[in-house]
Each structure stands twice: as C-alpha cells, then as structure tokens.
C-alpha cells in the first residue's frame, strides 16, 4: 500500500508541477507551491510569468515598427481632418479637392429636411437640434458657394427628386398596379391549362383501358 501511496503522490506532484517555459503556450502557475518548493522552482515560476509577458509584449511591439505606429496615427489624423473640414466652414481649401465625396455626403442631409416633415414633425425637431449643434454655420456656407457652381447644382437637383418626390409618387400607383397585373394573367392561365391537360389524360386512360 505504501508504494501505491508514494506512486499516487508522485503522480500528483508531477501533474501539479508548473510546466517549463514554452514559446507557444503560457505556463500554468500554481501559487500553492510557492512556499513548499525551493528557489529553483520559484525561478522557474518567475520565468513562466516573465516569458509569456515578454512574448506578449514582443507580439505587440513587433507590428508597430513594421507598420509604423507614428505614421499610422498621423495618417488617421490626416484622414479625420478632411472629414472635420467638410463639416466646418473655415477650411475651404480642402473642399474643391473633395467635391464629389462632399456633395453626396452633405446633400442627403438637405433632402432629409423635406422628407422628415412629411411623415411627422416630431422627427424634424431632433434633426434641427442636431444640425445647429454640429454644423449650423457649415451647411449655410456650403450651400451658398455650391449654388453658383455648375457641378453641385447638377448633382443636387437629382438628389432632391429622387429622395422626396420619386419615392412618394410611385407609391400611390404601385398598389393598384399589382392587383391588375396579377388578375390579368390568372384569368387566361386557368382555362388554358385544364383544357390542354384533360383531353391528353383522357386519351391515355382510354387507350390503357381498351
């Protein structure tokens, strides 16, 4: 019995011992053995603690020099600056470079104003509150210079009829059209199919019976 007990104790100790440091997997630390084992095991445990941290830090630090952390932040800031300039009026120099993206981005805001009062005035009030808070003066100066120009009016005119006028007008004729279209094909299809099918089935059945 003593040998079996010793064997079980050794197995338990072997499974409970911390694993050696491995580059792929962080070690499993058991704090209960901190007092009972010698400094060597403690050093192994500390190595287990440090190696995963170092490996994790190395994994984090490697991509930044390769991608360039500072230029990345600068690129993000540069990308955000034109977006802010589109909303704010002072920077007019970047607007001519981004006529195409700026016009579609701001025009949907303008057609929303005529669209919102049609369904309900309550939805119009929050848009008014949000617009003066963020770009109240931005939309006015943008619309003023766009009107004299030739490119914005062309793209601004199709946007207005597409959003408020066209979707509202076809909605009225659409409901009557589907029932008329569905009734017309149903009337000729129903009589044609049975007339063609019955005589064929009758002939085959008669031949088989005969």
From Swiss-Prot:
Family: Belongs to the amelogenin family.
Protein's name according to its UniProt entry: Amelogenin, X isoform
Record's GO cellular component terms: basement membrane; cell surface; endocytic vesicle; extracellular region; protein-containing complex; supramolecular complex
Taxonomic source organism: Mus musculus
Stretch forming the signal peptide: 1-16
The protein's assembly and partners: Interacts with KRT5.
Extent of Pro residues compositional bias: 170-179
Function of the molecule: Plays a role in the biomineralization of teeth. Seems to regulate the formation of crystallites during the secretory stage of tooth enamel development. Thought to play a major role in the structural organization and mineralization of developing enamel.
One GO MF term: identical protein binding
Broad class of the protein's primary localization: secreted
Tagged with keyword Repeat: yes
Gene designation per UniProt: Amelx
Residues found modified as Phosphoserine: 32
Gene Ontology annotations of biological process type: amelogenesis; cell adhesion; enamel mineralization; odontogenesis of dentin-containing tooth; regulation of cell population proliferation; response to calcium ion; response to nutrient; response to xenobiotic stimulus
Residue numbers spanned by region Disordered: 109-187
Post-translational modification: Several forms are produced by C-terminal processing. Phosphorylated by FAM20C in vitro.
InterPro entries (UniProt xref): Amelogenin
Positions with biased composition (Low complexity): 109-119, 136-169
Keywords: Biomineralization, Extracellular matrix, Phosphoprotein, Repeat, Secreted, Signal
Localization (cell): Secreted, Extracellular space, Extracellular matrix
């Amino acid at each position: 019995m003593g040998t079996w007990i010793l064997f079980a104790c050794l197995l338990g100790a072997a499974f409970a011992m911390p694993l050696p440091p491995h580059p792929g997997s962080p070690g499993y630390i058991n704090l209960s053995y901190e007092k009972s084992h010698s400094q060597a095991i403690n050093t192994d445990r500390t190595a287990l603690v440090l190696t995963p941290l170092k490996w994790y830090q190395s994994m984090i630090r490697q991509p930044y020099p390769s991608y360039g952390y500072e230029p990345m932040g600068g690129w993000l800031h540069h990308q955000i600056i034109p977006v802010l300039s589109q909303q704010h009026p002072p920077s007019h120099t970047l607007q001519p470079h981004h006529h195409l993206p700026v016009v579609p981005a701001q025009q949907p805001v303008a057609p929303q104003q005529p669209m919102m009062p049609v369904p309900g005035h309550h939805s119009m009030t929050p848009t008014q509150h949000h617009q003066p808070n963020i770009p109240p003066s931005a939309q006015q100066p943008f619309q003023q210079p766009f009107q004299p120009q030739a490119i914005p009016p062309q793209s601004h005119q199709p946007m207005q009829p597409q959003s408020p006028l066209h979707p509202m007008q076809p909605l009225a004729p659409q409901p009557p059209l589907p029932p008329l279209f569905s009734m017309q094909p149903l009337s000729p299809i129903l009589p044609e199919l049975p007339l063609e099918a019955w005589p064929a089935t009758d002939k085959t059945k008669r031949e088989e019976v005969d």
